[in-house]
Regions:
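Re-entrant/interfacial helical elements at transmembrane boundaries that shape
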Residues: 19, 239-246
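Catalytic phosphate/nucleotide-handling subdomain of diverse soluble enzymes
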Residues: 248-255
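Active-site cavity-forming subdomains of large catalytic enzyme subunits
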Residues: 57-223
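Flexible, glycine-rich loop/tail regions that form catalytic "lids" or insertion modules at the edges
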Residues: 225-227
Length: 255
């Protein structure tokens, strides 16, 4: 019998962070088929930070429940979790760990950077600076329109070391995605190749019944915290790593 590999599709027209997701689903399916298994995609809710503030943490937990229950309900041998926006990746990891089914995380990747008045700019860090300049009458309405077109020039997650990029690095550090899978841009051939590799890896872990709950340890999360400090990542990473560790019975503290 061929392994059944589930592929979680979190695409939404409202979610530009996941604008390339349907293509990644198809690339993942190609990797699964090439490895001799059956890929079947299914949806869960899609969270976009811009539209879920200030309740996005609550919605993270709701998405974790959605992910867990769908993975438990379906006849899966392994699963590919595809997402990217801030709360999505920790929600998917939390749900998958509780479902206790082998999985691979695939992130959508960061958007390209823009240029405004000769400076490299990226959402969401520069939008706050530019808005402050506008409110101080240092920028015109036309300037703000130009900046808006440059802050989000492509699909993908925020092109700064915010929560999305931070969590992608943390998950790669934990060994839950294809090596090198955290940073490739959303609009790159490398992102598509990573999706195909994720499909192949999902089949491999299904055949081995390689479940992260069996090998994630306190040292694993301590290592992720070290990387968090090394890259100057988002402080939200601490909150999400703590929640993820709790799903495998690890009490992660600042001590």
């Amino acid at each position: 019998d061929k392994p059944v590999i589930g592929i979680i599709n979190t695409y939404s027209d409202f979610n530009s962070c996941h604008g390339n997701l349907n293509g990644l689903v198809e690339a993942s399916k190609a990797g699964v088929l090439a490895a001799g298994a059956l890929p079947l995609s299914f949806p869960t809710i899609s969270l976009h930070e811009s539209f879920s503030f200030p309740t996005s943490m609550y919605l993270r937990n709701l998405m974790a429940m959605d992910t867990e229950e769908m993975m438990k309900a379906l006849p899966l041998d392994a699963c590919i979790l595809i997402g990217g926006c801030d709360k999505t990746v920790p929600a998917q990891i939390m749900g998958a760990l509780s479902a206790n089914i082998p999985f691979v995380q695939l992130v959508t990747g960061p958007m390209s950077v823009g240029s405004f008045k000769g400076d490299r700019v990226g959402a969401c860090t520069d939008c706050r600076r530019i808005w402050a300049d506008y409110r101080s009458d240092n920028l015109t309405d036309e300037d703000v329109l130009e900046a808006s077109n440059q802050l989000v020039p492509t699909v993908g997650t925020c092109g700064v070391m915010g929560t999305a990029s931070t969590m992608a690095l943390m998950v790669e550090t934990l060994g839950l995605m294809v090596p090198g899978g955290a940073c490739a841009p959303a609009v790159s051939a490398q992102r598509v190749r990573i999706a195909e590799e994720s499909g192949t890896l999902a089949v491999k872990i299904a055949n081995l019944n390689n479940n992260p709950r069996d090998w994630l340890t306190e040292r694993s999360f301590e290592n992720a915290l070290r990387v968090l400090l090394a890259v100057g990542g988002s402080t939200n990473g601490i909150i999400h790593l703590t929640a993820m560790a709790g799903r495998v019975g690890i009490n992660l503290s600042l001590d």
